[in-house]
Amino acid sequence: MAHRSRLSGLIIDCETGELLSAATFWSQALGLPVGGHEVGETSEYVGLEGTAAGLSVGLQRVTHPSRVHLDIEADDQDAEAARLEALGARRIGWVKRWWVMEAPTGHRFCIVKMDKPDEGPPPNAWT
């Protein structure tokens, strides 16, 4: 079945109890104003605004060492995971509403649901 995907986000994973302080640093470092702040039972996110159309940059509080990861959005997350597995990636697990994947190089990334397919750059079409 054909599906579409594209790069959607750059996520700065922060192993810290002070995510807003980290957001202030990255806001000033990147010249992007701090946006929305979302706190859940087990998660915390802060967005940065003013990025290129269709690309989000945000910070996420994590319990693992700090790093950066990419989000790839797809209209069919399972099909995209299978496509990337065929390229050598492996599924780490399903978390909330996305796949956590690992590239052959060891880099982790996520496959998230494509929310706004008509905004931003056109997605790649895969068959």
Which stretches of residues belong to each language-model region?
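Positions that flank functional sites
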Residues: 41-42, 99-100, 121
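Extracytoplasmic/periplasmic beta-strand context in beta-sandwich domains
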Residues: 8, 44-46, 99
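A generic structural signal for short, solvent-exposed coil/turn residues
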Residues: 2-4, 24-26, 40, 49-51, ...
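Conserved short beta-strand elements that form part of the metal-binding/catalytic scaffold
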Residues: 30-68, 108-116
